[in-house]
């Protein structure tokens, strides 16, 4: 799916980390207090912790969300990042429809640059909590993933209008905005739960990176074309040591993305599990 996924974890550059549950045992020397999965590569520790964020809701006729207990949505925030005519057209159409239904509409800063909208109705993303009941993302799956990661802690629901290619997560057609969005505004949706990976990287006892991932985390040597050696621990228990091109750790949501391309299995989105897929392993001990 689109950037910033998959996150690249490089021993040389150390960008992002990973996620799981709490653990009672750690690999010797592991400074991490997170539980779940640890990947150890020389002096670098990549810790993964499963976060109990509910990650999705589905409209009964399908749509992608981060859950909420609200049955009705009055204040709607519009998000978009792709500066293409199709996105601008859908934003204008969506805005007109929401206003016709008596909803209050605000634009996230990047989306506001694509349309003519009053300055007092523009909000940065970090001010959405408490200001909007529902976020609607116009774009592709990557736009939805980015918004989901940014807004996960706030639990603001997200609905996707597809202006990308695949539309796994943003599967409402621009031609069906009125037909598909109106039932959601009235509370006609079904909630499903998905989790997110919380990630951190520690080197020489110092935290050097952390983040969230809806799809997957990838351990990779970066731009260098070489194999890397590492050990994998789950809940503090040694699983294996490996030399390979890297490792993918994916959520069930992300099992349809990079992990699938690397030969991993497809998981039911609601399954409480993770996919671990080695990239071209040379050894597995």
Language model feature labels by segment:
Residues 12-30, 36-37, 49, 56:
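A cross-taxon signal for low-complexity, glycine/charged-rich
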Residues 43-46, 50, 55, 62:
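N-terminal, intrinsically disordered charge-dense segments
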Residues 53, 65-134, 175-190, 201-211:
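ATP/NTP phosphate-donor binding region
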Residues 87-88, 142-148, 255-261:
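Short glycine/serine/threonine-rich phosphate/pyrophosphate-binding segments
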Residues 104, 155-157, 275:
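Proline-centered loop/turn at the N-terminus of a beta-strand
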Residues 151-161, 168:
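Gly/Ser-rich helix-loop-strand patches that form or flank binding pockets
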Residues 166-245:
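Catalytic core of DAGKc-family lipid kinases
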Residues 237-285:
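Gly/Ser/Thr-rich active-site loops/lids in small-molecule metabolic enzymes
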């Amino acid at each position: 799916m689109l950037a910033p996924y998959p996150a690249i974890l490089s021993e040389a550059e150390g960008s992002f980390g990973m996620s799981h549950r709490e653990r009672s045992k750690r690999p010797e020397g592991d400074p991490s207090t997170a539980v779940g999965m640890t990947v150890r590569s020389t002096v670098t520790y990549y810790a993964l912790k499963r976060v109990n964020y509910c990650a999705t809701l589905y409209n009964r006729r399908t749509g992608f969300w981060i859950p909420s207990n609200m049955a009705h949505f009055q204040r709607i925030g519009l998000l978009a990042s792709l500066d293409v005519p199709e996105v601008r057209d859908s934003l204008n159409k969506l805005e007109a429809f929401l206003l016709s239904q008596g909803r209050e509409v605000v634009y996230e800063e990047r989306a506001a640059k694509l349309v003519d909208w009053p300055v007092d109705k523009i909000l940065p993303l970090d001010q959405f909590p408490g200001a909007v009941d529902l976020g609607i993302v116009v774009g592709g799956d990557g736009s939805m993933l980015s918004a989901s990661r940014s807004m996960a802690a706030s639990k603001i629901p997200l609905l996707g209008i597809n202006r990308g290619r695949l539309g796994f997560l943003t599967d409402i057609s621009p031609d069906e905005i009125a037909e598909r969005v109106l039932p959601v505004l009235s509370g006609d949706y079904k909630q499903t739960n998905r989790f997110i990976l919380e990630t951190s990287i520690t080197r020489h006892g110092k935290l050097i990176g952390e983040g969230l991932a809806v799809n997957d985390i990838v351990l990779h040597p970066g731009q260098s074309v070489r194999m890397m050696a590492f050990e994998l621990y789950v809940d503090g228990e040694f699983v294996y040591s490996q030399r390979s091109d890297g490792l993918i750790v994916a959520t069930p949501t992300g099992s349809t993305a990079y992990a699938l391309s690397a030969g991993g299995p497809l998981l039911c989105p609601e399954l409480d599990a993770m996919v671990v897929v080695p990239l071209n392993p040379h050894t597995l001990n």
